[in-house]
Amino acid sequence: IILGESQTFQKNQPFPYGFIKNPINEKFYEELYKTYPSVDDKWYSADDYTRSSIKRHFGRCKANNIIDEDDTSLSEYWNLLFHYLNSKEATEKMSEYTGLKVTKLRSFNFVLNRKGDFNLPHSHHVGIKPEDYEYKFTVLIYFAKDWPKGAPGGTYISEGEDESTIIFEPTDLDNSWICFSETPNSWHGSRYMTHDVPRPSIQFTMV
């Protein structure tokens, strides 16, 4: 499914991005969904004036410091997914999908958005040369089975630093992903959540 969408990703404008439904095998997805980690003291606030959410690292990992070992507080399915994303096969397939050569996982986080959370339009590499990018693309995978039809809160793609320039916003957040390349113009965000259904997701980057 994923590699079949590579041309769409690479040709999309104003920068490469792609939305994919059912990127994860259905049975495996069900196990990930059922064992998505509950909120405890391992989660931390990612709030500032531009955004609001809570996040959780995998095991002893931090941004730009991936440690490929089990997290015994998580299910075997989450450990399998994490180890797969650290594999040569995963980086090769993501390189083929995006057209961007990557060799390793750079970050992996659980991200939970709830009512009142948001992320203002932003881009990660404004004024930075491509050879100095911290990572080459970002992927968010959603686990929100009961997401209200058409509700705000999925990570959108925009043409600029204003929500009036949104060109794509996912509204099916049950086993779906959005991936976008990192450029100085890779504007994205998520609209203010007005409903009570949470948005469980993971976010990972590669370099």
Predicted stretch roles:
Residues 6-96:
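Non-heme Fe(II)/2-oxoglutarate
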Residues 69-84, 90-207:
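Catalytic core of non-heme Fe(II) oxygenases with the double-stranded beta-helix
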